[in-house]
Design a protein with these regions (language model features):
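A short, Lys/Arg-rich alpha-helix, primarily the initiator
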Residues: 1-11
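Alpha-helical residues within the helix-turn-helix
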Residues: 10, 21, 50
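Short alpha-helical DNA-recognition segment
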Residues: 14-31
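Hydrophobic micro-packing sites on short alpha-helices
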Residues: 45-49, 59-60
Length: 67
């Protein structure tokens, strides 16, 4: 699943470490999410969207939608 996590995080001036702490995950998890190596659980996706005050669809792009 593609995402705009890195773009949104950087636009808000937040480090990977700060985001990881807020989400209660490791910095490595944030990096893996940003690089598309890891798809978040639905709970983590909601936490990310809530943290940035955006919809899940603004962060995560379902590849099936692009077809």
């Amino acid at each position: 699943m593609k995402n705009r996590l890195e773009e949104i995080r950087k636009a808000k001036g937040i480090t990977q470490e700060e985001l990881a702490n807020a989400l209660e995950v490791s910095r490595q998890t944030v990096g893996s999410l940003e690089n598309g190596r890891y798809n978040p659980s639905i709970i983590l996706a909601f936490k990310i969207a809530r943290f940035f005050e955006v919809s899940i669809e603004e962060v995560f792009i379902c590849e099936e939608d692009e077809k």
